[in-house]
């Protein structure tokens, strides 16, 4: 027999009931909005600069409005310059990020190896004279290694990075563990940072020009300014021209282009004038020739008429 339904037996869910049958619905996590960088658009800034320049070219512009527009133009040009510099900086960082990482890793490994060697020499029981000589020679190597490390870290982010270390191509020998131990001893004697990297200027003998700059900035304590590119005017003046010189170059280029367009237009007009003159000359030459031919034909017709009076009707 089926059981009869008892409404008293069915009870409502009590407050605080945490059974599986009456589990509360999970609330959606509300994530905070992502911080978006509101950088100005380059095309929008260029459009505003063009509009302001077009407005300043008006002759009937009042003096107070002209002053306001000139200030706005200076602000737009500064914003455009900053935005282009920011984009160039981010592009250079992405381009040379991996090379800088490998160089920094090799330089830190080289520096740590030299520091361990210095501790070993200082703790050794050798003579004081030999110990001092070794420590003095090692101090120079440590200084070079520190400059190399700072070179990889504080190289200007807005300039093309020149690598310090190159990968060594190791040949695969099949001589067993003795060959591998010999290779390790050779790498340690060469003074390289690791098994797969080697200083470039140790073979060429020429350091990058920025190396001496980094060494000088270490003494002056201006490495952070060097990394942000605020010392470019004092260091890399020959590599990158100043903005004023760039503006002059662009102005000169614009003048040359305008002169070329004017000369092209004038040459085109002169060609059209020459062509029209030649056409008129041809027409003037053709006109008397046509008149002569017409006269000759008329005279011939008159002569034929005098000779045959009547034609077929002549009796």
UniProtKB/Swiss-Prot annotation:
Residues 245-258, 269-281, 288-301 have a biased composition (Basic and acidic residues). GO terms for cellular component: nucleolus; preribosome, small subunit precursor. One of its GO terms (biological process) is maturation of SSU-rRNA from tricistronic rRNA transcript (SSU-rRNA, 5.8S rRNA, LSU-rRNA). Pfam families: Efg1. Residues 1-43, 173-201, 234-315 are annotated as: Disordered. Residues 179-190 have a biased composition (Low complexity). Residues 41-91 form a coiled coil. Keywords: Coiled coil, Nucleus, rRNA processing. The keyword Acyltransferase does not apply. It is found in: Nucleus, Nucleolus. Belongs to the EFG1 family. Involved in rRNA processing. This is rRNA-processing protein efg1. It comes from Aspergillus clavatus (strain ATCC 1007 / CBS 513.65 / DSM 816 / NCTC 3887 / NRRL 1 / QM 1276 / 107).
